[in-house]
Amino acid sequence: MPGRDQLTGQKALSGNKRSHALNTTKRTFDLNLQKVTVLQENGTKKTLRVTAKNARTLKKLGLVA
């Protein structure tokens, strides 16, 4: 599920896939994006696509609806 984190702007990384013979081919490390409903300051709800790490942080801060 490629894309960007709507909270921090984090995006996928690129790197190399290494075979047993140490041949290299380009690959991407995609983000683990999850849909999270967040309570805004004015009391409304908004759905964001954030990484699993940021979803845990939002839940810890009590901002998840």
Curated annotation (Swiss-Prot):
GO biological-process terms attached to the record: translation
Keyword Ribonucleoprotein: yes
Superkingdom of origin: Bacteria
Cellular component terms (Gene Ontology): ribonucleoprotein complex; ribosome
Entry keyword annotation includes Endoplasmic reticulum: no
A single GO molecular function term of this UniProt record: structural constituent of ribosome
SUPFAM superfamilies: L28p-like
UniProt keyword annotations, A-Z: Ribonucleoprotein, Ribosomal protein
Residue segments, region Disordered: 1-21
Family the UniProt entry places it in: Belongs to the bacterial ribosomal protein bL28 family.
HAMAP family linked to this entry: Ribosomal_bL28
NCBIfam families in the cross-refs: L28
Record's protein name: Large ribosomal subunit protein bL28
Organism: Metamycoplasma arthritidis (strain 158L3-1) (Mycoplasma arthritidis)
